Regions:
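A nucleotide-sugar donor-handling region in carbohydrate enzymes
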Residues: 4-80
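A donor-sugar binding/catalytic signature common to diverse glycosyltransferases
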Residues: 5, 137-174
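Short beta-strand scaffold positions
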Residues: 7, 28, 103, 145-146
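Short, glycine/polar-rich helix-capping loops at beta-to-alpha or helix-loop-helix junctions
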Residues: 11-15, 111-113, 165-173
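Short, conserved active-site loop motifs that form the nucleotide-linked donor/cofactor pocket
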Residues: 26, 122-124, 180
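Donor-nucleotide binding loops and adjacent catalytic segments primarily
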Residues: 45-140
Length: 187
């Protein structure tokens, strides 16, 4: 049986070689997130119509008159199940200076309630939204606050700056590219 390891980037192949894998076992595939955004989103295959996008932004009261807004995701256990970390995330939102749209998971909403954390006035807490709607917001926001490795990648591809709300990431290249900065809510 032939073992294969698939790497997003040549640097990941180098990491595999350093760990003792044979060069024939490692295939550099490129990043599928780039492919999804380029092939489907940017091409218009999964984009909202102009009218639907305007309705989404109007419903959330964002993007009017060139008013910048931020987007947020927060779902990692170390942030959501730790009241101190979740309070620090809310303090970051409070200090950011923009309205922040937060399509929150039900677990995150429940934690806010159970911990008695009142979201700041500039936070628009909504129920979860679909992927296409999320990409439209990510493409239209000034920056994104997130603890998601995937969202940081999507943001980098779309040219949207990000703030990583976690100690470490599986995609450290976003720091090298200048696409993201780090905020560790556990400190």
């Amino acid at each position: 049986m032939l073992f294969r390891s698939y790497a997003y980037l040549p640097a990941y192949k180098e990491q595999g070689l350093a760990e003792g894998l044979d060069t024939r076992q490692i295939v550099v595939t490129g990043n599928p997130i780039v492919d999804v955004i380029d092939h489907y989103f940017r091409s218009g295959k999964i984009r909202l119509s102009s009218q639907s996008r305007r309705e989404l932004f109007r419903r959330l009261n964002v993007g009017d008159q060139n008013q910048p807004f931020a987007l947020m995701t927060c779902h990692r256990r170390e942030n959501v199940e730790n009241p101190t970390s979740l309070r620090r995330v809310m303090n970051l939102v409070r200090a950011c200076g923009y309205q922040v749209v937060f399509p929150a998971s039900y677990r995150t909403q429940r934690s806010l309630s159970e911990f008695g954390i009142t979201p700041p006035s500039n936070l628009l807490l909504t129920d979860p939204i679909g992927y296409v709607e999320f990409l439209e917001l990510l493409d239209g926001c000034a920056y994104v606050l997130t603890d998601s490795g995937t969202v940081v990648e999507e943001a980098a591809v779309l040219g949207t700056p990000s703030v990583q709300m976690r100690l470490s990431t599986e995609r450290p290249e976003v720091y090298e590219w200048g696409a993201s900065i780090k905020f560790d809510p556990t400190i």
